[in-house]
């Protein structure tokens, strides 16, 4: 492996970490940038033009520059994830393969109740934490309390290069495509593959099977 390729991979990894830190905190401090390295990566990223730095009181805060952000591809996916199953894992694994960072927006309890007419089995923070614990997922965030997950605001915050939808998310896909077209955003929309085993393709079918087994 050439030194040039290795350096690019190291820089890309630092930029991924900076993007995720900024998504969590907004402009962030060195303390919030939790990246294990013996060197001072933030100053290197600033001097290379990948990060912007500004003094905010006693602390210096950092944010990605357009140049830095352009070096990574961010994928956004979303769903309810009320009882995670292998179909979710397959879809999120495919979504992650499309880019460098996978951000997943999880529907709030209010959104689920509005969409499905019932409260979810698991509360929103539990569902968010479970999704974030999946290997393909870099970060999971809660949506906003409307039937469209608040995707107009989420697209601004996440600024994805790609939005990936499951085979059964046609309504949500139409909503997001309308937002993208209305705001003239440069975002690619991708339809993920249908999971091969119908028995485990949806949370509702899985819950039905569990109910039958327990009855």
Describe the function of each predicted region.
Residues 2-215:
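Nucleotidyltransferase catalytic core that binds NTPs
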């Amino acid at each position: 492996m050439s030194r040039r390729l290795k350096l690019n991979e190291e820089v890309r990894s630092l930029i991924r970490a900076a993007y995720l830190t900024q998504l969590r905190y907004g402009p962030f401090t060195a303390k919030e940038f939790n990246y294990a390295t013996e060197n001072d990566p933030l100053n290197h990223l600033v001097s290379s033009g990948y990060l912007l730095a500004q003094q905010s009181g006693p602390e210096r805060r950092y944010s990605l520059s357009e140049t830095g952000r352009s070096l990574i591809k961010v994928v956004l996916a979303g769903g309810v994830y009320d009882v995670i199953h292998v179909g979710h894992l397959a879809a999120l694994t495919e979504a992650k393969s499309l880019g460098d960072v996978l951000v997943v927006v999880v529907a709030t309890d209010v959104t689920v109740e509005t969409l499905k007419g019932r409260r979810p089995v698991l509360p929103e923070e539990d569902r968010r934490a479970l999704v974030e614990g999946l290997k393909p997922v870099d970060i999971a965030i809660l949506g906003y309390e409307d039937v469209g997950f608040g995707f107009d605001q989420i697209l601004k915050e996440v600024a994805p290069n790609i939005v990936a939808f499951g085979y059964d998310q046609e309504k949500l896909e139409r909503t997001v495509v309308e937002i993208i077209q209305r705001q003239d955003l440069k975002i690619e929309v991708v339809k993920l593959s249908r999971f091969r085993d119908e028995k485990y393709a949806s949370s509702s079918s899985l819950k039905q099977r569990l109910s039958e087994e327990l009855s």
